[in-house]
Amino acid sequence: MGRFLLVTLSLLVGAFSLNEANSCCCPQDWLPKNGFCYKVFNDHKNWNDAEMFCRKFKPGCHLASIHSNADSADLAEYASDYLKSDGNVWIGLNDPRKQRTWVWSDRSSTNYLAWNQGEPNNSKNIEYCVHLWALTGYLKWNDTPCKALYSFICQCRF
C-alpha cells in the first residue's frame, strides 16, 4: 500500500509539473505553437504600426513568420476562428528595399512561401507588404500596400 501511494503521488507531481510547463510559456488567449506564442489582434493598423505594436510586448516579438504548410494551416484556422473571415491579416513578410526580395521581420529564413495564384504582382508598384488573404481562408498570401489597414498576428517567445 505504501509503495502504491508513493508511485501515485509521484505521478501526480509529475503531471502537475508537465501541466505547468505547457501553460507557463504563453499568456492566456495566445496560441502556443513550436516554441512561439501567437495572437491575432483585430485592431486595424498599417504594416509598420502592426510590427511596432508586436515589438512592444518584449524583445524578439514580431509579426508572425510562417515556415511550413502545417504552420500556415494552424494560423489560418486560428485567424478564421478569431476573425470569422472578416478581413485580411498582416504577417511579417515584407520587401523593405523594394527590390522584390521578401524578408521576415524577425530575420528568419524565407524557406516557405504560400502566394495566391498570380501573386506577388506588385500592382501599381506600391505593394511591399504581405497579408493572409481572407478570401482564401487565410491560407494564401497577397502583396499589398503597407499603408493598408488590417488585423495582424503577433509572434513572441514568453
From Swiss-Prot:
Swiss-Prot/TrEMBL keywords: Calcium, Disulfide bond, Glycoprotein, Hemagglutinin, Lectin, Metal-binding, Secreted, Signal
InterPro entries: C-type_lectin-like, C-type_lectin-like/link_sf, C-type_lectin/snaclec_domain, C-type_lectin_CS, CTDL_fold
Disulfide bridge partners, by residue number: C26-C37, C54-C154, C129-C146
Tissue distribution of the protein: Expressed by the venom gland.
Residues bearing carbohydrate: N121
Chain positions recorded as Ca(2+) binding sites: E127, N142, D143
Claim: Repressor is one of the keywords in the record: no
One Pfam match: Lectin_C
GO cellular component terms listed in the entry, alphabetical order: extracellular region
Motif segment (Mannose-binding): 119-121
Ranges where the C-type lectin domain occurs: 33-155
Location within or outside the cell: Secreted
Keyword hit for Protease: no
Gene3D superfamilies membership: Mannose-Binding Protein A, subunit A
GO MF annotations in UniProt: carbohydrate binding; metal ion binding
Coiled-coil regions listed: none
Leader sequence segment: 1-23
Role played: Mannose-binding lectin that binds to and agglutinates erythrocytes in a calcium-dependent manner.
Subunit architecture: Homodimer; disulfide-linked.
Family of this protein: Belongs to the true venom lectin family.
This protein's name: C-type lectin mannose-binding isoform
